[in-house]
Amino acid sequence: MDPEETSVYLDYYYATSPNPDIRETHSHVPYTSVFLPVFYIAVFLTGVLGNLVLMGALHFKPGSRRLIDIFIINLAASDFIFLVTLPLWVDKEASLGLWRTGSFLCKGSSYMISVNMHCSVFLLTCMSVDRYLAIVCPVVSRKFRRTDCAYVVCASIWFISCLLGLPTLLSRELTLIDDKPYCAEKKATPLKLIWSLVALIFTFFVPLLSIVTCYCRIARKLCAHYQQSGKHNKKLKKSIKIIFIVVAAFLVSWLPFNTSKLLAIVSGLQQERYFPSAILQLGMEVSGPLAFANSCVNPFIYYIFDSYIRRAIVHCLCPCLKNYDFGSSTETSDSHLTKALSTFIHAEDFTRRRKRSVSL
């Protein structure tokens, strides 16, 4: 395989490639120059406002802070940093792929997108593990689920994400084609393709498997508790519903784009390409907006499904309602689940020990 003929998209944005065939494909997609600027402006406005309110509400909320809130604040900060770059891509789409803001912002904005993607996936994975420990292993996890541990984990995630984004700075460049500037990906060598494949597997698909595994274990534990109690516990049923909504939102946001990226890398490593570059480029171009929209929907998901965050946001926006209670209980759904399942697990352990002692 000739390295000079290898040109697939490797970054987390479907920017116009120097490859003329891909550039032609990009220009033939009718909605990009009209729909995407409008869509990204809406994502920018709602996302910046939503994440700012979410960070402010949780940071300045009086009283003790939940452990999960530390991860949520960092996730909102990651989304906010990415959203700041969206106006640059709005200008790019409106100008039919031309990059008019210089080489520094070409590299810098692509780097921030890569850091955001890695940071978001790792934070969501940690949040899933934290929820798994809180609900499935409430007693054993007490020594791990501490505030200082959460801060160390978040700092490590930021450091690792910044390191993983560094290849983007080297692979992105401002390219002149017919005297027109394009922020594009350099032609990929086989070695770079292999590195991209390994990085994609370990920074997306492995965390994705961890997230799905954690939530499946949580759902199974909740179902076992529901069957054991024999009661129609609305909070437990709602919690199971929320779990699948969170997983579904993550899958819809990132799986199509990263699957297209995976196929593009595998196709580039093969002697004979089974997937035409135009089809792969179109797949990433269509699925890219779904991935980026995830940065603006998270605050709304938390507001709708987390009563604790809903109260914090309302109190932040309307201090006059500070003493007004927006629910019958001040505890979060996780608190209810932790207490209920802790009792359930203790009962299970007691039953096992009793059966074991009887059998002996």
Curated annotation (Swiss-Prot):
What membrane topology does the UniProt entry give? Multi-pass membrane protein
Q: Cytoplasmic side of the membrane: what ranges?
A: 55-69, 142-149, 214-239, 306-360
> Could you give one GO CC term from the UniProt record?
external side of plasma membrane
Q: Which PROSITE patterns match?
A: G_PROTEIN_RECEP_F1_1, G_PROTEIN_RECEP_F1_2
- What is its subcellular localisation? Cell membrane
The molecular function GO annotations come to: C-C chemokine binding; C-C chemokine receptor activity
Please indicate which superkingdom the organism of origin belongs to: Eukaryota
Provide one Gene Ontology biological process annotation: angiogenesis
Sorted alphabetically, the keyword list is: Cell membrane, G-protein coupled receptor, Membrane, Phosphoprotein, Receptor, Transducer, Transmembrane, Transmembrane helix
Post-translationally, this protein is described as follows, namely: Phosphorylation is necessary for YWHAE binding and efficient surface expression.
Q: Which Pfam families match?
A: 7tm_1
Alphabetized SUPFAM superfamilies for the sequence: Family A G protein-coupled receptor-like (SSF81321)
**InterPro entries the record matches:** CCR1-9-like, GPCR_Rhodpsn, GPCR_Rhodpsn_7TM
Phosphoserine is found on: 359
Topological domain (Extracellular) residues are 1-33, 91-120, 171-192, 261-284
Membrane-traversing stretches: 34-54, 70-90, 121-141, 150-170, 193-213, 240-260, 285-305
Family that this chain belongs to: Belongs to the G-protein coupled receptor 1 family.
Complexes and interactors: Interacts with adapter YWHAE; this interaction promotes ER-to-Golgi transport of GPR15.
Quote the function comment for this protein: G protein-coupled receptor that plays an important role in immune homeostasis. Acts via its natural ligand GPR15LG, a chemokine-like polypeptide strongly expressed in gastrointestinal tissues. GPR15-GPR15LG signaling axis regulates intestinal homeostasis and inflammation through the migration of immune cells. Controls thereby the specific homing of T-cells, particularly FOXP3+ regulatory T-cells (Tregs), to the large intestine lamina propria. Also required for skin localization of thymus-derived dendritic epidermal T-cells.
**Protein name as catalogued:** G-protein coupled receptor 15
